Amino acid sequence: MPSVRTEDRVSREVSITRLFDAPRELVFRCFTDAEHIATWWGPEGFTAPECASDPRPGGKLRIVMRGPDGAEFPVDATYLEVEAPTRLVIESNAVGPDGAVLLEAINTVTLVERDGATEVTVHARATALVSEAAAMLVGMDAGWTQSLQCLDDVLTGAVDRQFVIMRVFDAPRQVVFRAWTDPEQLQHWWGPKGFSLTIDEIDVRPGGTWRFTMHGPDGVDYPNVSRYEVVDAPRRLVFMHSGEGVTAEDPAFRSTVTFDDMGGTTVLTMRAVFETAAARDLVQEKYHALEGGNETLDRLGEYLDTR
C-alpha cells in the first residue's frame, strides 16, 4: 500500500439506535451468523453473495457486497470483542480493487432487551486512509440506516410484502422533506406522469390527515386518505395510506419515507408495507403501483431541478 500523508486521513463517527421487535438472541445471531448476515447486510438494493463469519475474539468476518449495478465491495473484518448476546466490537476494512485498504473502522454494536424487543445501537468510527476514500465516509450514516432497515424487514417478514424505491436527489434533505410536506409544492409533482392533484386537507403532524384526489390523464379520479404516524423533520415520514375505504380490493399499507443526507445530496427511500404479500400483489396488478411510484419520484426529481 502506498504511503499516506497524515493530512489525507479523514475520520467520521456515527451512532444509530434502532428497536427491533425480535428476541435479543435472534438479533445477535443476525450480526454473527453468516447465513443471517447475508440476508440483510448492505444498503438498500445491495446483496451479500459472499459471507463468512467466525464470531470469536480474533475471528474473521468477510463480506462481499454487490451493488445494484453489479459492482462488488469487499469488506474484511476482525471480531475484537464478542459478548453474546449483548455486545460486539468489530474492526473492518473496505478494500479496493487492488487489495489495498481504503477505509478502516471500529464498529461497536450493543443489544439491550426492551420488553421482549431488542434495542440495537451501532457506533462506528471510520477513517479514510487515502483522500480518494473520503467520499465513502459521507454515506456511512445512510448506509448503516438502510442496512438496519433491511434487517428489520427480514425480522418482520416484510421483504415479500413491500415495495421499496430509492433515489438520490441533488438537493439538501431539508429541501426534499419540505417538498413532501408543503401542499403548494406537492401540487407540482405528486402522482405518476400525466396525473394532477387536488389536496382537500393536509395536517402534517402525528395523527394528522392528508386527504387528496389524484386525477388521471384518462379522467378517472382516485381519492386517497393518509394519516401521519411519524413526522421527524427532516429525516422521516410514516403514514398509513388508503383509498376511499379499506377493502379486500383496496388494502391499506404503511408508507415510510426516509431522507438521508449524503454530503449535501439526499438519499430518499420510499417503502410501502402491506399486511400480506397477496395484498401487495393485488395493488401492483390493479394500480401498477411500483411503476407509478417510480414515475412519481421522476417528477419529484424534475421539480427539484427547477428549484
Where is each model-derived feature located?
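A generic structural micro-feature
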Residues: 8-10, 55, 69-73, 99-103, ...
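A short, structured loop/turn motif at beta-sheet edges
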Residues: 24, 56, 80-87, 110-119, ...
